[in-house]
């Protein structure tokens, strides 16, 4: 006897590299073919590959040498009916006429490898046949798994989904000999528990899923069972068929209509609406009496005559033979499953009555409640008739009655299902083996049955995977030692391993059926009545043949689709029906949205409009992205023209039947024309209206800028006719009317907060004293609050269209980006103002107080989550004119220096800490806008506008999608306002800041730098003495709200920190520990954002700008560029500061309320008494006059503010600056950094050496040429600009304790650390960035 060949080990260590992954790419194509709207993960495809190789082993075990050998092996090993379908598919694959549709699995790769599996070379046609069988089975598995995934409302097929769906399919389980170990237990591991309470949206979403399932059941009745009756017109009379199926076609038509209405309503739901308004869908149909067919069907199906007629019909021998010839088990399915399936519409109608009540209870819209109430009223007569019919015929309707067990209608919560299974298992004594939940997904029914040959009655539990036979424990539960379980296990039957056979009544039993296992053992169970037997047989047969009937329905639907393709107009008449090709549209590889919709990579404008309004599916994300970004490749007028053209769909060319009807003067009503109108025209037109609605709702500024555009849209909307379109047209008209009113009346939505905003804080200046407003006279809390309110308003007004295409840097920026430019200009002005405030404070004591006050404002910014304000201060303190003020920084309190360190760290390492912080806070907040601008610039410049495909330019929509993602992130922080009170005078003060006055950018830059040299000359060991300009106290009011007036800090995210003078050591920002020191500078190659000021050059349109190592340039703003009216350039700076090692410095103690006096700087130990009068100002010429810092309304001057000066050098320079060289044009993406070598002669941290280093030009008027490296000192400060301090009327000077302790010799400047690495310079992010002449 010949020994059977050993199976080939595909995944052994030796063979795995040859086979693993060979089929995965092809299997993905098969999946896309059978379920184009779903995706499959890699793990699932590898699992199917394993199954396919397992199947290949089975086929090769017979040593096939011809196609007939393979066919015989398939017939012997494949379960029925899958063997017939697999053979038919394989035979068609080897026919010559099928060469136009080749197989997807790689035959050419598998054919040579089969020699290794079989041990001999096989003919190519045999390999082709085998591969065709394997492809059919893989498609069948993916089809089954996809249906399961679709039913559970997921969008990706996983390995677990394949296992679960195969577990429920007896045919595939038999084929692959799978273990029944996949059940609900494994599925419930990641599912959160549900409370069972459904809101309105959940109800509608669940109803859509149930209607789709219900529609499939109706298709099963009509297209599988009724078609089986219609196959033999001689055997079944039309009247007999009508008695069985009644008006099921009318029910099907109603269901299709209702499902379409609900889906359209969900798609067209306004974003401002709390939920879809489904009431109108039911109201319209109820008023048309469209639900009346349910009454007729109930009357026919529930009548006793139905069962009598059906039983007589099925008793005919010819009828039994007819159904048996269609498919194995089909006769039993007709006899037992069809009558129960016909009851589904009856019970589904009652489901509608309950659903309407639930929707009404959950609805939040009064109009929707009215519609639902009208629908309930209109259906009251139908409900009464249904109840009357039901009571008249009174079928015993029990909770366990298997009305429809065909489809796996599981409990809505898997947790409830597993709970039910666990309860049953606990109630069975003697249970062994796997838990029920590990091998079953659904509980079907339970009840008593008699086991023929047994003494006692059995209680049966039926699941989709198991049938459990138990013996009741009669009276034993009360006895000690016995189990408390109600049942004792007798037998278990695995459903996929048994056959169900109907038994005719005999002397030994009646109402019986037989379970036959594979080993030919059989068990006969008998019911008490014919009705109970029918219930059990319906459940068992539906479970056993479910997969067969499923496949029959799928094949019918596929055949219909192939035989009746959707007729469309010719491309010459309607250009939106041109076939997809690489010349007009491309999709992202292996990428789909969560809803399974393919993601567009690029396409022509026509193809993008087609997909925007596609007839097969709606893509809300694509609509939002398109309307946000379309202006970069299409004008609004062009878009309107295209959408109107898309809406006006011509009829397809008439068929011969249509031509005959037209000749007779009749309207053509062919089936394919009706299908065209229903499946193409109506969906497309609804989606065009949906795009119009989104356009006017979210992008109305297009219509504000072009009134002709609005007039054309209104004219078109008013011309739209059709009942289905009516409510959508009315919706668009309402939105336009509302927008017009808001535009005319300035209507704004009133915002209500849970708590009232905190009162306004005042310091020295009070309301009505506008002319005295200043950094030092206003309360630091209120300065931060009012600036936060102003910047929040500016941030929230920026529209996505102002960013797409970098339009804020283009010629028409004033028109296209007005709100963005306002924010940029405000940020620039505020940064310059902070810098000016510091530099113009000549008196050392005043200057330290000003810097300290700015740090307090920074703390409040942090508490308010105003990151834009934080980085404005960082930018100001790191400006060239402020950064060099070493003595000022050294006199700052240690705690405040640490606060500044933390703030500077936000901008380091690609803003890593800032991004983490932003994600960790709750709105409201004001994000740093510069990071978005840089990311958009990088995306715009780093990706081409068009994709080249076969010589054609396709719009690169992937690029637009990336930009839209950035704008979407901006928008998510625009919704939450601050609970703060606007103070009108302070608001006007900050809105009209004009620190530059009438000076040009160059003049203002020189002025600030010269002033900086004047107040702290180069190499000075102590600052010069200047008289105080202010007559008021420099003591800070602190940043704790006034507890005397209000004890809470409502209105801010959290209470402000206590005043720094009184609080213990505390840092507002969570920081990296000081022990974490960086030994090297991180040099990011592409910063994420226009950061705060780097040492950068300028360009008209740059965010990060370049600096030539030999040029002199400065920067004072963190934002991208605005062209300035008084100068060519706009400077953007970002201090990329890095923490170096430092020695701890304990500063000399500074008692509260004590101020530095300039006399104290010249003598050791000299202390000035409190009674000493203030120093007399020196008789010397006043500083250069600057325009007063009294705010001036912008008036007609709304241009950007000139840019700041170039940064000062760290080394002495010649008296005259060298000419500034022009930079060659550079691209802003991936520019390498220029690393300047560290200055020579920095051997150690010697204080005298530090003092000897020249920190300013030899001449005050000499601008520096080498930018100073930004080294983090122990206080990283941000440059600010400030006006002259306001002079209030001088009150009598009280005795002041002005005796500043004599300053000892300055300790080593640990705040200015040595460079252990080259300093960092940033390059331009835009092309053609030039250094100013």
Swiss-Prot record:
Signal peptide: none annotated. Residues 596-740 form the N-terminal Ras-GEF domain. GO terms for biological process: B cell homeostasis; insulin receptor signaling pathway; lymphocyte homeostasis; regulation of pro-B cell differentiation; regulation of T cell differentiation in thymus; regulation of T cell proliferation; small GTPase-mediated signal transduction. Residues 199-389 form the DH domain. Pfam families: RasGEF, RasGEF_N, RhoGEF, SOS1_NGEF_PH. Residues 1019-1061, 1077-1099, 1141-1333 are annotated as: Disordered. Residues 1079-1099, 1276-1288 have a biased composition (Low complexity). This is Son of sevenless homolog 2.
């Amino acid at each position: 006897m010949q020994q059977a060949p050993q199976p080939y080990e595909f995944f052994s260590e030796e063979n795995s590299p040859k086979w693993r992954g060979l089929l995965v790419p092809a299997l993905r194509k098969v999946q896309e073919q059978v379920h184009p709207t779903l995706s499959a993960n890699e793990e699932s495809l590898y699992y199917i590959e394993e199954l396919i190789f397992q199947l290949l082993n089975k086929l090769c075990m017979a040593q096939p040498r011809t196609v007939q050998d393979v066919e015989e092996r398939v017939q012997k090993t494949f379960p029925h009916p899958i063997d017939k379908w697999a053979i038919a598919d394989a035979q068609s694959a080897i026919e010559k006429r099928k060469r136009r549709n080749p197989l997807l699995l790689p035959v050419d790769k598998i054919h040579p490898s089969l020699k290794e599996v079989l041990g001999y070379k096989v003919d190519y046609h045999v390999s082709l046949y085998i591969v065709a069988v394997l492809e059919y089975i893989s498609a069948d598995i993916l089809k089954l798994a996809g249906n399961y995934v679709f039913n559970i409302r997921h969008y990706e097929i996983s390995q677990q989904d394949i296992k679960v769906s195969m577990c429920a399919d007896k045919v595939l389980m038999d084929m692959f000999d799978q273990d029944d170990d996949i059940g609900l237990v494994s599925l419930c591991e990641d599912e959160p528990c549900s409370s069972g309470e459904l809101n309105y949206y959940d109800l509608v979403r669940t109803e859509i899923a149930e209607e789709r399932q219900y529609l499939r059941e109706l298709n099963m009745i009509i297209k599988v069972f009724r078609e089986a009756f219609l196959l033999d017109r001689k055997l079944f009379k039309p009247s007999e068929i009508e008695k069985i199926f009644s008006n099921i076609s009318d029910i099907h038509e109603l269901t299709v209509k209702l499902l379409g209405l609900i889906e359209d309503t969900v798609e067209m739901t306004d974003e401002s609406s709390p939920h879809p308004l489904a009431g109108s869908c039911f109201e319209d149909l109820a008023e048309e009496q469209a639900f009346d067919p349910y009454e007729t069907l109930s009357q026919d199906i529930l009548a006793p005559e139905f069962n009598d007629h059906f039983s007589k019909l099925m008793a005919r021998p010819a009828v039994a033979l007819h159904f048996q010839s269609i498919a194995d088990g089909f006769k039993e399915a007709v006899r037992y499953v069809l009558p129960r399936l016909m009851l589904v519409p009856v019970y589904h109608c009652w489901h509608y009555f309950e659903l309407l009540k639930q929707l009404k209870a959950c609805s939040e819209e009064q109009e929707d409640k009215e519609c639902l109430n009208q629908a309930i009223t209109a259906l009251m007569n139908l409900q009464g008739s249904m109840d009357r019919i039901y009571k008249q015929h009174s079928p015993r309707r029990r909770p366990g009655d298997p009305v429809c067990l065909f489809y796996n209608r599981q409990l809505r919560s898997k947790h409830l299902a597993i709970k039910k299974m666990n309860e049953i298992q606990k109630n069975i004594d003697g249970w062994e083996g796997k838990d029920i939940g590990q091998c079953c997904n659904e509980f079907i029914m339970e009840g008593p049955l008699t086991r023929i040959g047994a003494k006692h009655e059995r209680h049966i539990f039926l699941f989709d995977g198991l049938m459990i036979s138990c013996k009741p424990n009669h009276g034993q539960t009360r006895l000690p030692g016995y189990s408390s379980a109600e049942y004792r296990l007798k037998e278990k039957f695995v459903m996929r391993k048994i056959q169900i056979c109907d038994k005719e009544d005999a002397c030994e039993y009646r109402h019986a059926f037989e379970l036959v296992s594979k080993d030919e053992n059989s068990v006969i169970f008998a019911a008490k009545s014919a009705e109970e037997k029918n219930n059990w047989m319906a459940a068992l047969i539906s479970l056993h043949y479910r997969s067969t009937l499923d496949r029959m329905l799928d094949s019918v639907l596929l055949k219909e689709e192939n035989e009746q393709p959707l007729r469309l107009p010719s491309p010459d008449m309607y250009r939106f029906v041109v076939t997809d090709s690489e010349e007009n549209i491309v999709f992202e590889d292996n990428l789909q949205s969560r809803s399974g919709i393919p993601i567009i990579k690029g396409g022509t404008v026509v193809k993008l409009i087609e997909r925007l309004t596609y007839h097969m599916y709606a893509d809300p994300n694509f609509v939002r992205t398109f309307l946000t970004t379309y202006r970069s490749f299409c004008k609004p007028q062009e878009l309107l023209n295209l959408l109107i053209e898309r809406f006006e769909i011509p009829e397809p060319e008439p068929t011969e039947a249509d031509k005959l009807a037209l000749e007779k003067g009749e309207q053509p009503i062919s089936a394919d024309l009706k299908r065209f109108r229903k499946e193409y025209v109506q969906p497309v037109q609804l989606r065009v209206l949906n795009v119009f609605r989104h356009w006017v709702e979210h992008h109305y500024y297009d219509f504000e800028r072009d009134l002709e555009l609005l007039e054309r849209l209104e004219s078109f909307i008013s011309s739209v006719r059709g009942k289905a379109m009516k409510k959508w047209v009315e919706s668009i008209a309402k939105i336009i009317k509302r927008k017009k009113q808001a535009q005319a009346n300035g209507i704004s939505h009133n915002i209500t907060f849970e708590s009232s905003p905190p009162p306004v804080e005042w310091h020295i200046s009070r309301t009505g004293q506008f002319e005295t407003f200043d950094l030092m006279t206003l309360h630091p809390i209120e300065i931060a609050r009012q600036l936060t309110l102003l910047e929040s308003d500016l941030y929230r007004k920026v529209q996505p269209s102002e960013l797409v295409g970098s339009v804020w840097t283009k010629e028409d920026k004033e028109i296209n980006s007005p709100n963005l430019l306002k924010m940029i200009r405000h940020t620039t002005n505020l940064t310059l103002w902070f810098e000016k405030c510091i530099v113009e404070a000549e008196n050392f004591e005043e200057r330290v107080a000003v810097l300290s006050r700015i740090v307090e404002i920074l703390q409040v910014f942090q508490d308010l989550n105003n990151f834009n304000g934080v980085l404005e201060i960082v930018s100001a303190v790191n400006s060239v004119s402020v950064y060099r003020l070493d003595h000022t920084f050294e006199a700052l309190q240690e705690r405040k220096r640490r606060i500044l360190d933390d703030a500077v760290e936000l901008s380091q390492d690609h803003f890593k800490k800032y991004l983490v912080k932003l994600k960790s806070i709750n709105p409201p907040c004001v994000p740093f806008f510069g990071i978005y601008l840089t990311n958009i610039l990088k995306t715009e410049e780093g990706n081409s506008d068009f994709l080249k495909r076969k010589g054609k330019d396709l719009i690169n929509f992937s690029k637009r999608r990336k930009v839209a993602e950035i704008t979407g992130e901006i928008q998510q922080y625009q919704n939450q306002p601050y609970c703060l009170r606007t103070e009108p005078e302070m608001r006007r003060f900050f809105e009209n800041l004009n620190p530059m006055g009438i000076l040009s950018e160059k003049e203002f830059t020189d002025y600030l730098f010269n002033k900086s040299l004047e107040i702290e000359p180069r190499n000075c060991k102590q600052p010069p003495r200047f008289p105080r300009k202010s007559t008021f106290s420099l003591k800070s009011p602190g940043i704790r709200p006034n507890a005397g007036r209000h004890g809470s800090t409502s209105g801010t995210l959290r209470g402000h920190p206590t005043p720094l003078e009184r609080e213990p050591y505390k840092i507002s920002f969570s920081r990296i520990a000081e022990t974490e020191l960086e030994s090297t500078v991180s040099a990011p190659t592409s910063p994420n954002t226009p950061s705060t000021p780097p040492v950068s050059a300028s360009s008209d349109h740059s965010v990060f700008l370049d600096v030539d190592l030999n040029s002199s340039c400065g920067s004072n703003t963190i934002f991208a560029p605005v062209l300035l009216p008084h100068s060519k350039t706009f400077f953007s700076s970002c201090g990329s500061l890095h923490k170096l090692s430092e020695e701890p410095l304990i500063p000399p103690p500074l008692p509260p309320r004590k101020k530095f006096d300039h006399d104290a700087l010249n003598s050791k130990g000299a202390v000035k008494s409190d009674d000493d009068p203030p120093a007399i100002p020196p008789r010397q010429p006043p500083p250069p006059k600057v325009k007063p810092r009294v705010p001036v309304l912008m008036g007609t001057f709304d241009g950007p503010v000139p840019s700041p000066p170039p940064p000062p050098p760290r080394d002495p320079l010649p008296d005259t600056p060298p000419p500034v060289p022009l930079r060659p044009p550079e691209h802003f993406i991936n520019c390498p950094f220029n690393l300047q070598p560290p200055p020579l002669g920095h051997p150690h941290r010697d204080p005298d050496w530090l003092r000897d280093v020249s920190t300013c030009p030899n001449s005050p008027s000499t601008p520096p040429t080498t930018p100073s490296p930004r080294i983090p000192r122990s206080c990283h400060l941000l440059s600010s600009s400030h006006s002259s301090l306001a002079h209030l009327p001088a009150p009598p000077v009280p005795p002041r304790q002005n005796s500043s302790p004599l300053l000892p010799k300055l300790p080593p400047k640990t705040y200015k650390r040595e460079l252990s690495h080259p300093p960092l310079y940033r390059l331009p992010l835009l092309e053609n960035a030039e250094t100013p002449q």
